[in-house]
Structures are given as C-alpha cells and as structure tokens.
C-alpha cells in the first residue's frame, strides 16, 4: 500500500503494491521504500541507456526512480508468484505490471522476476530481471 510520503513516485504504486503483497509478513515498513535497508544493493540485470547496473543505498534508489512517471505510468500489478527460501532469507517474486508509456502512448506490459534477500526484516539485496524488449517497445513505440 503506497503512502502520501512518496506521492512523487505514484506512477510506481502498482509495482509497490504487488511486491509488498509478495513480501507481506517478511519485511517491516508500510511502503516499499520503508522496507529497504539504508545500505541495500539493487542489481538490474538488463541494460537501458542512462540506467545503472547497480544502485547502492536506499536513498539512491529513491532518487533513481524519481523520474519514472515521466516515462511510464503503471496502472496495475498482478500475476504474483512467491517462492520463499526461509533458511537463506531469500524470496523470489514473479509478477507483471501494466501501464502506458507517456511519450508514445503505447501499452506497457512487462514481466519481472525479482530475487530479494531479507535480513532483520529489511530488504538488503534485490536482483531484478525483466522483459527488456517489452520496455523498449513501449518507450520507443517500435
């Protein structure tokens, strides 16, 4: 459930909601950003011009996502699958998000697999895989 504290990131609310549903009972924090450890590491195993392969730190992640709504506005997150390895503290989330690319008006439908490591009820590592072709087609209209 998204809160007003992060209203400038409202274009991502369906993402926040679907992943927090998948992490329910495993992390502390009402909002996705609140569930992230200050020194967490995020790895993005896809490449887009200007997007880093690794982001270190909660505040850096928040800053990186600050312009998301200029490019894509999400409308829905669904198809959630959750696989939890309790011994290792690792959760694999499979989900989809749907929305619209702002500049092209193209539909944006994407599938993700996120491998999340949790320690002390906070996200400490996030490895993200997605269908980069779906994103590229929505953003370029091609």
Feature annotation, model-predicted:
Residues 15-26, 49-54, 69-73, 94-96:
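Short, mixed-charge, low-aromatic patches
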Residues 9, 30-89:
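A solvent-exposed, acidic/Ser-Thr-rich amphipathic alpha-helical stretch
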Residues 1-35, 140-141:
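Short, low-complexity N-terminal intrinsically disordered segments enriched in polar/charged residues
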Residues 2-7, 66-142:
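A beta-strand edge to alpha-helix "cap/lid" segment located at domain peripheries
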Residues 25-31, 46, 108-110:
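Generic detector of bulky aromatic hydrophobic side chains
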Residues 4, 17, 46-50, 101:
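Residue-level detector of alpha-helix boundaries and kinks
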